[in-house]
Swiss-Prot record:
Keywords: Amino-acid biosynthesis, Arginine biosynthesis, ATP-binding, Cytoplasm, Ligase, Nucleotide-binding. InterPro entries: Arginosuc_syn_C, Arginosuc_syn_N, Arginosuc_synth, Arginosuc_synth_CS, Arginosuc_synth_type_1_subfam, AS_cat/multimer_dom_body, Rossmann-like_a/b/a_fold. Its EC number is 6.3.4.5. This is Argininosuccinate synthase. GO terms for biological process: argininosuccinate metabolic process; L-arginine biosynthetic process; urea cycle. Homotetramer. It comes from Nitratidesulfovibrio vulgaris (strain DSM 19637 / Miyazaki F) (Desulfovibrio vulgaris).
Amino acid sequence: MAKAIKKVVLAYSGGLDTSVILKWIAVTYGCEVVTLTADLGQEEDLDGVDAKALRTGASRAYVEDLREEFARDFIFPMMRSGAVYEGRYLLGTSIARPLIAKRLVDIARAEGAQAVAHGATGKGNDQVRFELAVNALAPDLDVIAPWRIWDLRSRTDLTAFAEQHGIPLSTSSKQYSMDRNMLHCSFEGGELEDPWCEPGPNSHVMAVPVEQAPDTPEYITIEFKKGDAVAVNGEAMSPASIIRTLNTIGGRHGIGRLDMVENRFVGIKSRGVYETPGGTVLHIAHRDLEGICMDRESMHLRDQLIPRYSEAVYNGFWFAPEREAMQAFIDKTQETVNGTVRLKLYKGNAYPVGRTSPNTLYCHDLATFEDCATYDHADAAGFIKLQGLRVRGYAQRVKKD
C-alpha cells in the first residue's frame, strides 16, 4: 500500500477472527480502527458487540440495522430475476456481501478512512465479493485482507494472539462454519468436508428435518406487485417481514434444505449445506405467477440471463455494469407480474396449486379442450407447414444420403 493508512473501517462480527483482526490491524499499521457490525437478520444477539469492539481497541463502533434495506434493495431485486446458481443455490451468502461492502465504503467516507478491511479467508468467495464491491464503489480505498498477509495460520494461533492481547474469548465451540442472515443459513467445514457424509442434526437451524414436519399440509397465499411480494395470507408486510414470515412458515415444513458441491469463483469445489425456507417458497411462488402473466418471449429471454445474472451475484459483480443492465431488463419484464399465488406446503415441498392475476395472459377459450369458436384447429396445419420448412429442407439436402 503506497499511501499511509491512518484509519481503517473493519467489517466486524464480534467473533474470534474479526476481534483478532481488529487488534492486529491496530498493532501492525499503528492506525485507528472503526468497526461496522451489520444486522442482516442473522438472529444473533448483537447487544454488547460495540462495547467489545471498543474494549478490543476500536475508536468507534457502528452497529446498524440493515434488515429492511437488505430485503428491499438486494434480496427482492435478485428474486425478481429468478436467480439460482448452478441450478440449485439461491445465493443467500452472496447477496449479503454487497450491502456490507457498501456500508463499509459509506462509513469510510464519513470517517475519512483510507482503507476498509474484512475477515474473509484466502480460499473463499467472500474476499472476492467484498473487494470487487469496494473496487466498484470506491476505487481509491485500499482493502486490507489479513488472512492473506499475516502469519497466523490456525485457530490455535488466533487464540494465542487473543490471549496475548487480552481479547475476550468465547468458550463455545461450533461443529460447522456457519453464515446466517434473514435469507438463509449456510454450513461448511467439519464432517461436511467429506462429500459422502450426511449432515448431522446440528445443521438444522431454520428448517426442521423433513421427518419432523407436520403430517398435515398448510395452504398459504402470497401476493405480488411488479414481481415483489407485498402480502402473505392477505396481510400487507414490509420486505423484511415477508422474508421472516415465510421463514417461519416454510421452516416448520422442512422447506428449503440444500446439500450440494458447488464451484467457487476462485476455482475450488466446495460442499455446502444451505437452509433457505422463506426464499425457496418465494422463488417457487414468483416463478409460478410469471407463468400466467408474463409474455412468452420476454420470459424465455429473461431465462437465458438467469445463469449469467446468478454468476454475477455469486462472483461478486453486484455493482458491475452488466448486472445493472440485466436488472434493468428484468425489472421491465416484471411490470406485469402482479397477482396472487396459492401454495400447499407439505414435507419439504411447496406446491403451487392456484394463481390469479389482473394481468393474466391465460385465455380459457383458447386453452380449453372443449369446442370453441375462438380457435380454428385447421389453422394449425399452415403453422406447422411453415415451421417445418427449415427441417424439411435440411433433411432433403443434408440427410438424403
